[in-house]
Amino acid sequence: MKNIAIGILGAATLGLMASAASASTLDTVKAKGFIQCGVSTGLAGFSAPDDKGDWQGLDADFCRAVAAAVFGDGTKVKFTPLSAKERFTALQSGEVDVLSRNTTWTINRDTALGLNFVGVTYYDGQGFMINAKKLPGVNSALQLSGAAVCVQSGTTTELNLADYFKANKMEYNPVVFEKLEEVNAAYDAGRCDVYTTDQSGLYAIRLTLGSPADHVVLPEIISKEPLGPAVRQGDDQWYHIVKWTYFALLQAEELGITKANVDEMKNSPNPEIKRVLGQEADTKIGTDLGVSNDWVVNIVKAVGNYGEIFDRNVGSGSPLKIARGINALWTKGGLQYSPPIR
């Protein structure tokens, strides 16, 4: 879900940002010995605590990848659950070092909030879920005129919903809540006919409902929701480390480097693989970035490549079973693409 920044940042917020940016994030992180990662309050497949209280998901694993790049140890990360309303302030103030919380990259957030998005870890789009028993025969969002629709307030989801119904000359009754947990509970209790959010979120939320099989995700996608991690503006070194961690995950998948074979691949005769894994004698890619030259080895050992992260958290190896689709590599018809690591 995505919070909308309304109005102009106040002087107090700007002061917090200036204070947070006064020291190098890398130095601060190294001094405390871990990365503080802002995640959701609980979204299956992306960031949610398991039965042992350990955070799991694509967004959580991305922060582990950053920790592995910096420390050589993917466990050196602590997670801070943040609501949609809290997330940007937490990053601006320095409460978290990285925000990896199913957040949509928009022009306002990129230019007005003092944030830098590092890439798109998940290409998503807004969709609709219905209780098929309450709305028998409905198989398209264009059949939802007059429906009560549950939605989280202060989000791009809320705005997209209004635009979609207006554009299609339909009426609807918005049932609005501030917290995601409240939206989930209201929909499950039957207070609305329809639930709208990112389609990936709908698949995750469906698993938590009382009777998951009764609920159907409709085929329409009504928006572009490029979800990705963000860092504070003003610290280029930290931005580069986090950004190239994302690209390293993609490059590892493209080159066939996995958690299981990364040590073996260090002996590959392929010059590109040797360069990416820091095995060339004169390589300084890692040290120029501010980490060790075997930073990609450490990342892959900790979490695997991008494809492995996707599959176990949201894809074929997860309860969500979401197809790769446009999140496949560019070589397989998708949008995921890394610039050269050289």
Across the structure, where does each feature detected by a protein language model lie?
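Bilobed "Venus flytrap"/periplasmic-binding protein-like clamshell domains
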Residues: 36-45, 55-70, 124-182
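C-terminal functional modules
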Residues: 278-342
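Acidic, polar ligand-binding/catalytic clefts
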Residues: 64, 68, 72, 76-143, ...
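Extracytoplasmic small-molecule ligand-binding "clamshell" domains
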Residues: 28-100, 284, 291, 299-306, ...
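Sec-exported extracytoplasmic/periplasmic mature domains
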Residues: 30-31, 67-75, 92-96, 104, ...
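Sec/Tat signal peptide C-region and signal peptidase I cleavage site
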Residues: 16-23
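Extended ligand-binding regions for polar small-molecule ligands
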Residues: 61-64, 68-70, 132-135, 142, ...
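Bacterial N-terminal signal peptides that target proteins for export
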Residues: 1-8
